[in-house]
């Protein structure tokens, strides 16, 4: 953010127009999270953004995404060959059903639990498949489903709506 400010960027509105936007997508094979600056590497939304993956594949097709456990070319192939659906997942304990219902309602999606367990672990909606993986599940198994993958912020579900809305918007532009 310091570099952006030095180049004249003023932060007025999230996802508003700006002079420059620098995103750190990957750094070797390491994972980094700084909650104070809101920096997360790998970038949490790069796995479903074609405009990020296509140029990345041109320069580093075999580079591994340390969270997804797939190469950049595999991630791009995954979004090119799957249904028009976004899979969401969170490390939180099952998340907030009420929050997800509200988000789906606000986006005009239907919300239905597709699990018989008392606290459903999977929810389906139009273009949304909200998924809370078990701790034992590997990244490979999480990626095995259909649709691009978006990892929801683990600290607070109040921002999920913005993240999901941005993902749906990106999907609709593809």
Segments predicted by a language model, with ranges:
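Residue-level detector of anion-binding/catalytic polar loops
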Residues: 110
